[in-house]
């Protein structure tokens, strides 16, 4: 495809127009008095949301140069969402301010690379100052406040706090759509995986259609079991102990399955067979997780074990096992606490080093099954549009809560950023254009508070000046219209969210102000554009709009 190019001021200002177009749409949502944005979609109902990243992802501009700028701003929102799960609107507002002030400096003759160095130094200082101010999140009340601020709903805050209270800080919280109105919290106790019994003949409770085993042995095998003589020795040992048995294997079929079913029907002994969760290497890892949790061994040739040589010492134990048609839940496994803790540490290390989002998600699920539990928040609404909006807010609130637990909290409402500008007052010892770079960040940090105030119908600059005169931790509560101790009032932001917003905004702004040329694909020209005037009052001649610089 042929390309078209533009250079210098034209290029940078085209990018700025694109950043402004996206930021102007997003920033009307910031703060408790922010508005919603309605987005038309090519399929289904329109989306109504105040979630910055959702809005950003759906914005495409017609002008190819300006669209490049919008895509850069979109990257700020998506990267912040990936790292912290919230703060996407704040990040976009910061990026717009940094780009505006940065380009003014470039136009005035400042060296772009020196500005970039100053911006990077300022971000590092701001990040360190925010971490220093951070207050650890430990109480249920604080967790509820973080979630409530993000979702703008105290009921959501209480529900998320209850979930974390019950499943622990490493547990997983998922948000699902419900057919009924309102919010509902369901907690999964112990380890659960999405495989049910192989045969309904294993059911022990006809009413609930569940197989329930008390004080059970657990046999873990990564392959298929079909021959009875392979498992007969261990079955005889389990029968002598008068204990139920859970068999988890890739598959159980043929003679082995029919024998287990017959014994289950005759109540000779209690047994349930289920397929192992996952596939390939992930299946092996999940089986090993279950082995650690139950205190057993995975019966595999790699560790010198074969099915016909298994003893009771190789089996895991569980106080209770509940198996239904679709899921298996192991409650109170008999594994050593130290072994489980070691496995948890190993999984956390793998999560930190993984560079794949999918792998990280699956590792996080495994961690949750071992370390905490799984809480499912089901959300319902009267219409599909409202349901999507509620689900977005819930997902943001869950992410914000996780971020707060990880790094702590600071005052919300844009106050923490307005106060932290004081660490940049001395210019960090920089001079010349690097000092100008520091000042770009210092000025831009006021933008979120400015827009929170403006969305509340107030003069942003006046509110910013007043907040800077207050003590750290104090600021303007736009929900009540009062200047107050924001932390005491529960107006708080996770440090991780705030730091990520600043860092990602600065990263894109620094790249944009050092841009000197743009290269885009030349738009395809339709046949109708080559015609001549047909007397309808519209030009169909050869005059085509050109991008900046042409």
From Swiss-Prot:
Main location: cytoplasm
InterPro entries: Chaperonin_Cpn60_CS, Cpn60/GroEL, Cpn60/GroEL/TCP-1, GroEL-like_apical_dom_sf, GROEL-like_equatorial_sf, TCP-1-like_intermed_sf
Coiled coil region boundaries: none
Protein name: Chaperonin GroEL 1
One GO term describing the cellular component: cytoplasm
Gene3D superfamilies to which the protein is assigned, alphabetical: GroEL (3.50.7.10), GroEL-like equatorial domain (1.10.560.10), TCP-1-like chaperonin intermediate domain (3.30.260.10)
Molecular function GO labels: ATP binding; ATP-dependent protein folding chaperone; isomerase activity; unfolded protein binding
PROSITE patterns named among the record's database cross-references: CHAPERONINS_CPN60
Function noted in UniProt: Together with its co-chaperonin GroES, plays an essential role in assisting protein folding. The GroEL-GroES system forms a nano-cage that allows encapsulation of the non-native substrate proteins and provides a physical environment optimized to promote and accelerate protein folding.
Region annotation (Disordered) ranges: 524-550
């Amino acid at each position: 495809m042929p390309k078209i190019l533009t250079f210098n001021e034209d290029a940078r200002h085209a990018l700025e127009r694109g950043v402004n177009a996206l930021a102007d749409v997003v920033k009307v949502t910031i703060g408790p008095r922010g508005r919603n944005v309605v987005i038309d979609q090519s399929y289904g109902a329109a989306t109504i949301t105040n979630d910055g990243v959702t809005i950003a992802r759906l914005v495409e501009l017609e002008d190819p140069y300006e669209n490049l700028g919008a895509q850069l701003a979109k990257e700020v929102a998506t990267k912040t969402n990936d790292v912290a799960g919230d703060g996407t609107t704040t990040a976009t507002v910061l990026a717009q301010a940094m780009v505006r002030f940065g380009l003014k400096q470039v136009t005035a003759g400042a060296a772009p690379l020196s500005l970039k160095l100053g911006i990077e130094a300022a971000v590092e200082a701001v990040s360190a100052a925010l971490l220093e101010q951070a207050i650890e999140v430990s109480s249920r009340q604080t967790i509820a406040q973080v979630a409530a601020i993000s979702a703008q709903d105290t009921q959501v805050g209480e529900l998320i706090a209850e979930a974390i209270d019950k499943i622990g800080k490493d547990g997983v919280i998922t948000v699902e759509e419900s057919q009924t109105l309102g919010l509902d919290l369901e907690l999964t106790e112990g380890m659960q995986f999405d495989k049910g019994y192989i045969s309904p003949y294993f059911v022990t409770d006809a009413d609930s259609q569940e197989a329930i085993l008390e004080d059970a042995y657990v046999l873990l095998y990564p392959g298929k079991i079909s021959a009875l003589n392979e498992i007969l020795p261990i079955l005889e040992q389990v029968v002598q102990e008068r204990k139920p048995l859970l068999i988890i294997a890739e598959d159980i079929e043929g003679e082995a399955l029919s024998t287990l079913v017959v014994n289950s029907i005759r109540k000779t002994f209690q047994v349930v067979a289920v397929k192992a969760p996952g596939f390939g290497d992930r299946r092996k890892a999940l089986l090993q997780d279950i082995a650690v949790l139950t205190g057993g061994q995975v019966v595999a040739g790699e560790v010198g074990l074969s099915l016909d040589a298994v003893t009771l010492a190789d089996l895991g134990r569980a106080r209770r096992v509940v198996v239904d048609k679709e899921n298996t839940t192991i409650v109170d496994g008999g594994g050593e606490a130290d072994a489980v803790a070691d496995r948890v540490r190993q999984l956390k290390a793998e999560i930190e080093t993984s560079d794949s989002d999918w792998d990280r998600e699956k590792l996080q699920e495994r961690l949750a099954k071992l370390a905490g539990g799984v809480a499912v928040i089901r959300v319902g609404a009267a219409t599909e549009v409202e349901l999507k909006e509620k689900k977005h807010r819930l997902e943001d609130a869950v992410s914000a809560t996780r971020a707060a637990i990880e790094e702590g909290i600071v005052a919300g409402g844009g106050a923490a950023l307005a106060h932290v500008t004081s660490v940049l007052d001395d210019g960090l010892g920089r001079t010349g254009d690097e000092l100008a770079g520091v000042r770009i960040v210092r000025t831009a940090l006021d933008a979120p508070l400015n827009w929170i105030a403006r969305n509340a119908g107030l003069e942003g600059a006046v509110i910013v000046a007043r907040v800077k005169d207050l003590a750290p931790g104090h600021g303007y509560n736009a929900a009540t219209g009062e200047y107050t101790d924001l932390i005491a009032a529960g107006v708080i932001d996770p440090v991780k969210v705030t730091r990520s917003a600043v860092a990602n905004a600065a990263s894109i702004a620094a790249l944009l102000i050092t841009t000197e040329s743009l290269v885009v694909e030349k738009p395809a020209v339709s046949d109708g554009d080559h015609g001549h005037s047909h007397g309808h009052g519209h030009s169909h001649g050869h005059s085509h709009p050109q991008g900046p610089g042409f």
